[in-house]
């Protein structure tokens, strides 16, 4: 199932009409919110962690071009081969070239949202290369031919009955059961067999340290470590914004990430990769490649306000607290990155023409901004994108691809008329008087808003009339 952002409204309606999906999400979201609240029990500590994480991300982004050059130089000095990709097509071509140069036919992949962004699995399949997900949630999603519905818990929309049905359909010899331990063991056994025969290991990167040329990988299942040590060749892929300046920047960001994502003080595994296998080492890959992807990030970087989207450390906390996402899930958005953060990232990746409906799918309640560990002002950025979807590019301001795509001459005329009306007191009083006298002619239905709400009706008298009567 591969949805499209242009179909957001019908996809959202379908999700709302699915009671099983809503029940799955409700339980998962409640659990994750409670875990985060427990992890940040002390408000003063929470604010201190968020302040420090925000400061680190802003400092690193302010030096991004220089840090990327430093990262490249230190990675090369360590023996890591660095590749640059402007877009998804270039990234996939690099992957294909590296894998085919080693005669590879099977790649095992750790969790990586950037690989989802470039649709790596499908691109490699066209080249005759099997790309198998090794994260349990990603593996379940892959079996169902779906995309992840959450950036840290890809199969959060599935319950154990649905997982068991998938295993019964796709895993030979599986005896249908709802026992969670048996389901996990089944997936683990399949994946371990694949690890033994894999030619290539693929992973994402949580933090890339410019100071030391180190790639940091956060995980809980151990599959990331297997992907980066068992195969002879390891390919890491990440967005250019993931670079940090110093090794000392990692622990504060790591603490903010784990507490915000899963409510953990620390994850089960934390991997630091600084080179291929050395002569005196017994394990690890013989080659390590790093693919640095732009794919619209430079455009966001050029805009001082939209640059804040690049602060994201992919924790998913904004999704867990969003009243829209928690009711419709991730697939309704039709984008790789769903929820609040997806609504401000996706326009840079796909253009406003394709994603114009997403910034409007928010109540602007501010919950996302209140829990963001790096204090991205998501509500303010959503309002900016709403304006840009309706307005033509302005001189001197970097324009998003597709800016003005949602512009409507009729809507523009209505707002210009409203502006004129409210700027002329005499005209406004006359129109208010007319509306109150004609209130009985108001239609009972006003589009989708009134499907489950009573249509608002003008008052019988204007405020000016009420105040005049009161002051008699």
Residue ranges and their predicted role:
Residues 280-309, 325-443:
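Ferredoxin-type iron-sulfur electron-transfer modules in oxidoreductases and energy-metabolism complexes
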Residues 224-243, 311-314, 341-343, 348, ...:
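Gly/Ser/Thr-rich active-site loops/lids in small-molecule metabolic enzymes
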Residues 137, 265-269, 397-400, 413, ...:
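Short coil/turn segments at secondary-structure boundaries
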Residues 433-472:
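Short linear elements at protein peripheries
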Residues 1-305:
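The feature marks the mature, well-folded catalytic cores of soluble enzymes
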Residues 90, 267-280, 314, 325-329, ...:
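A glycine-rich phosphate-binding loop feature that marks nucleotide/adenosyl-phosphate handling sites
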């Amino acid at each position: 199932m591969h949805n499209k952002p242009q179909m957001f409204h019908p996809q959202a309606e379908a999700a709302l009409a699915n009671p099983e999906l809503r029940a799955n999400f409700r339980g998962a979201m409640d659990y994750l919110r409670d875990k985060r609240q427990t992890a940040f029990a002390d408000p003063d500590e929470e604010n201190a962690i968020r302040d420090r994480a925000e400061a680190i991300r802003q400092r690193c982004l302010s030096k991004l071009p220089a840090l990327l050059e430093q990262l490249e130089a230190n990675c090369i000095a360590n023996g890591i081969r660095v590749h640059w990709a402007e877009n998804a097509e270039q990234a996939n071509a690099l992957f294909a070239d590296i894998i085919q140069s080693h005669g590879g036919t099977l790649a095992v992949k750790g969790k990586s949202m950037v690989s989802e962004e470039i649709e790596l699995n499908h691109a490699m399949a066209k080249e005759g290369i099997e790309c198998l997900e090794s994260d349990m949630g990603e593996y379940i999603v892959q079996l169902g031919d779906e995309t992840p519905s959450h950036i840290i818990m890809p199969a959060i929309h599935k319950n154990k009955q649905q997982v068991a049905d998938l295993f019964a359909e796709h895993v030979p010899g599986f005896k249908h059961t709802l026992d969670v331990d048996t389901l996990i063991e089944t997936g683990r056994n399949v994946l371990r067999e694949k690890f033994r025969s894999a030619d290539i290991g693929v992973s994402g990167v949580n933090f890339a340290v410019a100071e030391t040329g180190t790639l940091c990988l956060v995980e809980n299942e151990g599959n990331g470590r297997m992907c980066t040590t068992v195969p002879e060749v390891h390919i890491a892929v990440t967005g250019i914004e993931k670079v940090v300046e110093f090794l000392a920047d990692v622990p504060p960001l790591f603490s903010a990430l784990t507490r915000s994502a899963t409510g953990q003080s620390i994850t089960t595994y934390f991997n630091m990769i600084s080179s291929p296998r050395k002569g005196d080492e017994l394990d690890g890959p013989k080659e390590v490649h790093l693919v640095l992807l732009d794919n619209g990030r430079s455009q966001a970087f050029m805009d001082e306000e939209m640059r804040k989207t690049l602060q994201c450390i992919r924790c998913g906390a904004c999704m867990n607290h969003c009243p829209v996402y928690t009711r419709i899930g991730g697939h309704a958005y039709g984008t790789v990155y769903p929820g609040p953060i997806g609504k401000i990232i996706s326009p840079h990746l796909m253009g406003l023409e394709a994603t114009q409906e997403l910034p409007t799918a928010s109540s602007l309640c501010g919950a996302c901004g209140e829990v963001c560990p790096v204090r991205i002002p998501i509500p303010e950025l959503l309002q900016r994108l709403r304006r840009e979807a309706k307005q033509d590019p302005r001189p001197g301001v970097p324009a998003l691809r597709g800016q003005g795509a949602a512009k409507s001459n009729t809507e523009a005329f209505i707002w210009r008329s409203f502006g004129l009306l409210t700027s002329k007191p005499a005209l406004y009083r006359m129109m208010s008087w007319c509306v109150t006298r004609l209130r009985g002619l108001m239609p009972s239905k006003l589009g989708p808003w009134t499907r489950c709400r009573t249509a608002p009706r003008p008052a019988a008298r204007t405020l000016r009339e009420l105040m005049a009567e009161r002051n008699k």
